[in-house]
From Swiss-Prot:
Domain of life: Viruses
Protein name in the entry: Uncharacterized protein ORF21
Bias (Acidic residues): 201-220, 250-296
Bias type Polar residues, positions: 236-249
Chain spans, region Disordered: 1-45, 200-296
Gene assigned in the entry: ORF21
Length: 296
């Protein structure tokens, strides 16, 4: 009578201790594990049974080869997961392998989970993060308010770093209820940079002289404008530069003064012509008197 044959049992076939039946097979040293038990210190989990048997885990004792080590998760695996459970880190981004009866199958990583949020919720999250960052960077601030031309300017100067200033411009708050402009500039800029409003017609009507330095002076004037007035794309900004032109030396010159100069030059030429006519008439009268004296 022989015992039941199986991969985990030894056959009592009547051979002696050194016979074939007593030879240890490859399952020798296998450690029994029960599904659902806490993981051992070596890191084996029930997924190792997938490798040794080629089948999924079943209730009851499972034989695990001690030569195989797995680093799995400690929490219980949900039923929707693969036999190996969640992929181990740091290979999550590359995917994970699953042992099937037909062999090892490589599974790509799952798509990232996206949560749809409303715009107001995202805006609130952004504002909170920005406020936390500002508290860390700026620290305490001193706030001063002033009013110019029906526009309220609220300036927040950093106490720790005086080079940082925050300018808040409030416009049309009473009419529209909104329209707040908040910016941060260096301390030397006491208000938002204004848009340069330059009348092209005034520039085109600039009186041109015959000298060669006219073009250079006009270029200097444009460079002065570009250096003194900063441009801004914000439509709510108000021009503080105005429409003016310079002669390159820094003195302002309006269109009326330019036209006055042309009128003065015309008047000077008229005076010159009148003086020359008077001199000619005097010379003619003298020549006539001399001719009369000679005739006598």
């Amino acid at each position: 009578m022989s015992a039941t044959q199986g991969p985990l049992t030894e056959a009592a076939n009547g051979c002696d201790d050194t016979g074939l039946g007593k030879t240890k097979n490859h399952w020798d040293g296998a450690v029994p594990r029960t599904t659902g038990e806490p993981r051992s210190l070596l890191g084996e989990n029930r997924a190792s049974s997938v490798l040794t048997t080629g089948l999924g885990p079943k209730p009851g004792p499972v034989w695990v080869d001690p030569r195989i080590r797995f680093h799995g998760v400690s929490e219980s695996l949900p039923l929707t997961d693969t036999p190996w459970g969640p992929p181990p880190s740091p290979m999550d981004a590359l995917g994970h392998g699953v042992m099937t009866p037909s062999g090892l199958k490589w599974c790509p990583p799952p798509p990232p989970k996206t949560e749809s949020r409303s715009f107001l919720e995202l805006l609130a999250m952004h504002q909170k993060a920005q406020a936390d960052r500002d508290d860390t960077v700026t620290g305490e601030t001193e706030t001063t308010a002033r009013e110019e031309d029906d526009v309220i300017f609220v300036e927040e100067t950093n106490v720790n770093n005086p080079d940082v200033i925050e300018v808040i411009e409030l416009k049309d708050v009473t009419e529209t209820g909104h329209g707040t402009l908040k910016r941060r500039y260096p301390m030397r800029v006491r208000r938002a940079p204004k848009r340069l409003v330059l009348d092209e017609q005034v520039v085109d009507d600039y009186p041109a002289d015959s000298d060669d330095d006219t073009d250079a002076e006009s270029d200097d004037a444009m460079s002065v404008l570009s250096d003194t007035c900063r441009t801004d794309d914000d439509a709510s900004s108000v021009s503080s530069c105005g429409s003016f032109i310079t002669d390159g030396s820094g003195s302002e010159e309006s269109e009326d003064s330019a036209s006055d100069e042309t009128d003065d030059s015309d008047f000077d030429t008229d005076e010159l012509t009148s003086e020359s006519e008077e001199e000619e008439s005097e010379s003619e009268s003298e020549s006539e008197s001399e001719s009369e004296s000679e005739s006598e």
